[in-house]
Structures are given as structure tokens and as C-alpha cells.
């Protein structure tokens, strides 16, 4: 089990404090409608309607080498990519969901390509991961403050299993921490209302990350 040590923490944080300047990339299915990563929530789009972007997704011009090169030329020291945002769409080849880039026309593990490109430029590699997943059936729908179906009583939470969801989420975090080599920044997003801390199994999650990966820095958002 991971035990917090201030001296070790400060040492791990040195590069991040010194870096000061990095690139944070929000990119995914929501880039198609181009109305922001929260578009499904803001416009209360049903899953069935949002799926049209999944079937359309085929980013032929995706070139993380250009992103990484631009970051380096600008003097940046690290890059963070949204491996999965709140819509639940994975840019990586997760075995726990069908809602992923490898199942689209594109058929590629986009996180793998990104990681390779960033490392090739000598930059630190970061991945953003959403604790929230609006695609997963066990995540709270009706009455949740953020879910696209929060105002639709047809999406009652009666048969949703929160423990199943937490297990699923932890398993996906394990994947991104073990399948892509050293991850220098792991950025979790986010907590609200009663969805805080141990609701997500936070202690178990952090201990797992420390145990299975070479992750240097774990950052929650508020």
C-alpha cells in the first residue's frame, strides 16, 4: 500500500514545478460537433443521438507528432491528452468497453500513437482520465447534476449498480497505467456534490496506481 512521504513527494514534483509550461489537449468525439467537450451534458443529448459521432469518427489527419513538435518548439516540457472525457469515449484500446477509438472507422489506439510521439520529442507524457462516464449504464443518470439525462425520469437509477461502475473505472485506470509505459502525469477529473473522495474508491485507486505503474504525478481537478 502506498504511504505518503513528503520528501519523496517533493522530489517527484521537482520536474513539474520547474517545467511551468505544458500543453493540455482536449480532443475526442465532441470535436466533431465542435461545441466543447461538455456538449452532451449542456445540450442534454441522448446516447442514441450522440452515437452518430462515434460512427462518423475517422480522424485521418490525426498526427500527434505535429502536436508534440509544436509543444517542444514553444518551450513546453510536458503534454496531457484526454484519454477519456466525461462522454466515456476512449482514445485507447480498453477491453472494458466497446466505446473506443479502435472500434470506429479509424481503428487505431490513438493514445499509443500520442505517447510515442511525445516521448520522441523528449517531453513528459500526461494522460487525463474522467472519473465520470456518461456512456456507462451503471453511472447515475436521472437526478445527477451533470448527466445528460439528469432531467429525464425515464432514466431512473433503480437498476444501476454503483459498485460495478467503480470496478469498471478502476480497471480502465489500470489499463492506462500499465499499457503505455511510464506516465509522468495522470490527471483525474472530477468530483462534485456527494461524488467525492471515497465515493470513487479514491484510496484504493491511488494505491493501485502507485503499485502497478511508473506514474510520477497524480493530479486531481477541483
Can you annotate each of these PLM segments?
Residues 1-217:
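Mature catalytic domains of secreted/periplasmic carbohydrate-active enzymes
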Residues 218-222:
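A short, hydrophobic C-terminal helix/tail in secreted or cell-surface proteins
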Amino acid at each position: 500500500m502506498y504511504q505518503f512521504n513528503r520528501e519523496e513527494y517533493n522530489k517527484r514534483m521537482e520536474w513539474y514545478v520547474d517545467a511551468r509550461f505544458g500543453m493540455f489537449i482536449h480532443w475526442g468525439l465532441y470535436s466533431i460537433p465542435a461545441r466543447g467537450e461538455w456538449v452532451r451534458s449542456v445540450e442534454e443529448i441522448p446516447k442514441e443521438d450522440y452515437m452518430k459521432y462515434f460512427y462518423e469518427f475517422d480522424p485521418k489527419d490525426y498526427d500527434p507528432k505535429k502536436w508534440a513538435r509544436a509543444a517542444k518548439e514553444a518551450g513546453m516540457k510536458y503534454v496531457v491528452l484526454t484519454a477519456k472525457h466525461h462522454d466515456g469515449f476512449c482514445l485507447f484500446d480498453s477491453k472494458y468497453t466497446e466505446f473506443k477509438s479502435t472500434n470506429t472507422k479509424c481503428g487505431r489506439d490513438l493514445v499509443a500513437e500520442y505517447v510515442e510521439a511525445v516521448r520522441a520529442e523528449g517531453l513528459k507524457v500526461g494522460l487525463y482520465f474522467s472519473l465520470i462516464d456518461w456512456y456507462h449504464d451503471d453511472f447515475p443518470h436521472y437526478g445527477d447534476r451533470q448527466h445528460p439525462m439528469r432531467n429525464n425520469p425515464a432514466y431512473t437509477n433503480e437498476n444501476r449498480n454503483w459498485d460495478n461502475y467503480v470496478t469498471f473505472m478502476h480497471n480502465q485506470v489500470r489499463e492506462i497505467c500499465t499499457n503505455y509505459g511510464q506516465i509522468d502525469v495522470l490527471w483525474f477529473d472530477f468530483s462534485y456534490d456527494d461524488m467525492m473522495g471515497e465515493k470513487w474508491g479514491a484510496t484504493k485507486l491511488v494505491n493501485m496506481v502507485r503499485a502497478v505503474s511508473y506514474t510520477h504525478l497524480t493530479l486531481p481537478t477541483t
